[in-house]
């Protein structure tokens, strides 16, 4: 079951520690990280999905050679859609989408300026639209959570999914 564990303000997830600033470290981080600014853009959800699809292609997740790999890629695209949509509906829109891959997982981060706290709700009426986003995220991800932006309004909602085997 996923949790919204409290994190330190400087917790930015895997791949950010160590020798940041060194040319090799910056090059390696760029290879495993993709960043998309979303502030003031229109068509944000399809743009985020297209950006993520291209990253998955660059990283060899797509085109999928097996049903399991295809399902893993579809899960990533669905979670990106849900997190970005949630930021649009409840936080004034997303500012940035960050994708970080490791050999075992993919971490998605959506930064927004909102003060609310996302929480999964058990769908009361499974056949009706709306209110299912964080429930879907909780079901598909290894873990997810929220990192607050210190004294300022805003947060980063992150989710981790298993890499395809």
Protein language model features and the residues they cover:
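Extended, non-globular alpha-helical segments
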Residues: 33-61
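Short amphipathic alpha-helical interaction segments
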Residues: 44, 83, 128-129
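Short, well-structured hydrophobic secondary-structure segments
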Residues: 79, 85-89
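Conserved short strand/loop->alpha-helix "switch" segment adjacent to the catalytic nucleotide/phosphoryl-transfer site
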Residues: 56-81
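Conserved terminal C-lobe alpha helix of the protein kinase catalytic domain
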Residues: 46-49, 53, 77, 81, ...
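Conserved beta-strand-loop-beta-strand hairpin that lines the nucleotide-binding pocket
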Residues: 1-39, 88-165
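Short, structured helix-loop boundary elements
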Residues: 45, 49, 69-73, 134
């Amino acid at each position: 079951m996923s949790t919204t564990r409290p994190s330190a303000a400087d917790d930015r997830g895997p791949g950010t520690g160590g020798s940041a600033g060194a040319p090799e470290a910056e090059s390696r981080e760029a290879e495993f990280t993709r960043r998309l600014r979303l502030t003031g853009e229109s068509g944000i959800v399809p743009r985020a999905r297209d950006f993520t699809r291209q990253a998955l292609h660059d990283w060899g997740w797509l085109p999928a050679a097996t049903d399991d790999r295809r399902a893993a890629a579809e899960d990533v695209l669905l979670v990106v859609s849900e997190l970005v949509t949630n930021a649009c509906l409840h936080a004034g829109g997303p500012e940035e989408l960050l994708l970080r891959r490791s050999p075992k997982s993919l971490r998605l981060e959506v930064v927004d300026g909102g003060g609310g706290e996302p929480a999964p709700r058990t769908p009361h009426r499974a056949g009706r639209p709306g209110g299912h986003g964080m429930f879907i995220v909780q079901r598909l991800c290894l873990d997810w959570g929220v990192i607050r932006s210190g004294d300022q309004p805003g947060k980063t909602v992150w989710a981790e999914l298993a890499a395809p085997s």
